[in-house]
């Protein structure tokens, strides 16, 4: 291979690239063409007057990755051919084919809209690009102003980025599913947390404010507030030398809470 990789890493890279291709609804020829364009653009850059070699280390590393990607694409073509021979489809392929079908044939959406007049989409921050295109083609783009589509989601809880999910789909929802007349769909916030005390919410707000600037730029997320009945919380910060040490501390902490409650004749927190 163009870069040194263990066989297990090659398999992981292949599956990851293949999943991203399905999620973004592109085939190997499209990726290969873009990959070649990037290589040619880099090779065509003017060289430094006193450069000792044609490419800097960073440029050579980039080219090696491009060549490696080409090699992965060849393997993906073979992998997909084998899948077809065996009559298999994975979830990513099914989703990409469904999205392509809904885009290319408007009658599919017409049929679905005739059956479903109210559409509720939960955990929308965990949808991928192909899912977004699929749902938009079926129920969005202002094709039926009398149709009701509602999405619920929290971009701060997006946990499936590794499989292609994008919290920015929430931001796109407003224009993918516009209100009557073409205006952006309205947004309503559920700002009361019924499961967390205020101290935990304050800490979470500080944490996400520093780590999620890209998401916050795309989707404005107000801070949550505790319910009036929320109790106070104790926040502990610990560093452990191993995972086993962490497990032991957590188990002992809960053991102490239960033992104390038992001695006092009360229910544990």
Language model features with spans:
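Short helix-terminating capping/connector loops at secondary-structure junctions
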Residues: 4-5, 111-114, 143-146, 181-185, ...
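Conserved helicase NTPase motor core
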Residues: 18, 48, 57, 61-172, ...
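Helicase P-loop NTPase motor core
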Residues: 181-187, 191-269
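Short acidic (Asp/Glu) and glycine-rich catalytic loops that position anionic groups and cofactors
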Residues: 55, 149-154, 180-184, 231
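Phosphate/oxyanion-binding loops and surfaces in catalytic or ligand/nucleic-acid-binding neighborhoods
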Residues: 14-24, 28, 41, 45, ...
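Short, well-ordered amphipathic alpha-helices
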Residues: 135-139, 170-175, 249-262
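A general structural signal marking secondary-structure boundaries and capping sites
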Residues: 25, 105, 142, 177, ...
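Coupling/switch/interface segments within P-loop NTPase motor domains and analogous charged loops
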Residues: 1-81
């Amino acid at each position: 291979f163009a870069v040194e990789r263990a066989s297990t890493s090659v398999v992981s890279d292949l599956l990851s690239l293949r999943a991203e291709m399905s999620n973004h609804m592109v085939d190997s020829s499209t990726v290969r063409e873009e990959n070649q364009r990037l290589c040619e653009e880099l090779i065509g850059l003017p060289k430094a007057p006193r450069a000792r070699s044609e490419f800097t280390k960073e440029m050579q590393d980039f080219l090696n990755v491009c060549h490696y990607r080409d090699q992965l694409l060849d393997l993906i073509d073979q992998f997909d051919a084998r899948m077809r021979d065996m009559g298999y489809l994975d979830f990513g392929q099914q989703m990409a084919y469904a999205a392509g079908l809904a885009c290319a044939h408007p009658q599919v959406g017409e049929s679905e809209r005739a059956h479903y007049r109210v559409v509720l989409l939960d955990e929308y921050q965990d949808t991928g690009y192909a899912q977004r295109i699929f749902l938009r083609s079926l129920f969005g783009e202002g094709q039926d102003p009398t149709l009701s589509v509602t999405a619920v989601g929290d971009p701060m809880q997006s946990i499936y980025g590794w499989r292609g999910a994008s919290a920015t789909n929430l931001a796109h929802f407003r224009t993918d599913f516009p209100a009557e007349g073409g205006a952006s769909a309205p947004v309503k916030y559920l700002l009361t947390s019924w499961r967390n005390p205020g101290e935990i919410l304050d800490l979470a707000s500080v944490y996400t404010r520093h780590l999620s600037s890209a998401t916050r730029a795309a989707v404005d997320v107000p801070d949550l507030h505790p319910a009036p009945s929320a109790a106070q919380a104790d926040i502990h910060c610990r560093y452990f030398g191993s995972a086993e040490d962490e497990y032991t501390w957590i188990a002992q902490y809960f053991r102490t809470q239960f033992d104390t409650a038992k001695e006092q004749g009360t229910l544990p927190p």
